[in-house]
Amino acid sequence: MDLLNSGLRGSGPWALLAPSPRIIALLARRAGRMNPTMALVETSAGYPPVEEKKPFEEPPAVVVTPSDPWPRPYYLDNGLRRVAPYHFTYNTYCKQRWRGREILDIFSSEFRDRPIEYYKDAMERGAIAVNGKPVESISKIIKNGDVISHTLHRHEPPVTALPISIVHEDEDIIVINKPSGVPVHPAGRYNYNSVVEIMRAERGHGWNPLPCNRLDRLTSGIMFIGKHAKAAEALSLQISGRTVRKEYIARVKGKFPDGEVVCDMPILQISPKLGLNRVRANGKAARTVFKRLAYYPPEQAHDNPEQTELDKTRPPMAKEGYSIVRCLPVTGRTHQLRVHLQFLGHPIGNDPIYCNQRVWGTRLGANDSDATQDTDEDIITRLSRMGKSEVADAVAYHDEMVDEYNKKKAEKMSGELCEVCQTPLYTDPGEQELSLWLHSLRYEDAGGSWSYVSPLPAWALPPDGMDGPTEVGGMEELVEAVKEDNPEIA
């Protein structure tokens, strides 16, 4: 215990990387002793001091950190919140599809973010273990019940340095305005750079934030965080009960029609792995109400003799300017707003999936409910081929954005290696990897007992030299369009 405590405080020479209690118990039973052997990782002598609720101003002076470093090793740089690399141990049981396969084959095919040479080296130096013991051969066969451990030097992607601002707080809940590009929960390459962990770092290691609603990583806006389980459960049930109105703001391509537009097209998930959904007759029922808030024409006329070559290659909708659209989702299907806007011919302008000409062609999937333009297999194949060096033409109507994005995406890997683990390092994310022009603007109880609204994001405000709305009125006109069929939100 003294060893563990001193390691976690960073004041001792070693820190433990412990498996979960369930895995500890399993390994202990197999080994016939109270505790399994755990990996010891050397760590530096400490962390720089940090003010309460304030991230590091400079990178922490650590190269190797414990698996649960505290304070979290955040620092701010170039408008981004970064996490200093740290050692982390993943533990997993053998999955059914892994049974009878060689361990190197499993890692090289299932975890393709690193080359096969890395996994060979990791096995040779004992960073990959099975049932608490180093792998003696890269040809080791994995069987049912095996526990596989992988200790690695973890590099998290940076996220925006914008703060998680508080809209409302009481003894039960916190209402936040989530920045775009920050995932809610730890997932994939993101761990400490998540809403849950950032808020924990600000309020204390023992504090457990409980998200009550869901927002995609790229979506910004209103989120509810429960302070205790009872409050989180009650609010989650209220939201799922469809008596809570939600309003989003989107920036879409072209001039969106006047008046209220109701889209009732069903949505089908055609690729869970890629997170891809399409309008399909055999999909789940979905309904959204849209209303244009503002339209901003392009800065450059179509017949301008000073058009650049890039201007001439832009799709027609891109040359028609863009609209700011209010969105009221009556149902809550995955990617519902993005899919419905695409179907209506006005996809979100920087959507990396549904406004991507390399995937959907120049029509971008508009009014294609029967897959007459492209089959699902065609779309899945094209989306799967989008590699690290490719750029989505979805953003090709802003010269400055395209130039910067091409520079970022053309060299996804920086060409540099980590001095500790020799992992290839990524360049910083471009603007399109940090934001989506979709914002959760408002949540309110249909009975009128509460309502929370966030400010309009910068991309929804009038551009320089143009007039337009800077705030949004009530939801009555949106609700009016569907209240007969959906009285629960009236």
Question: Where are the model-predicted features located?
Answer:
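RNA pseudouridine synthases
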Residues: D2-A490
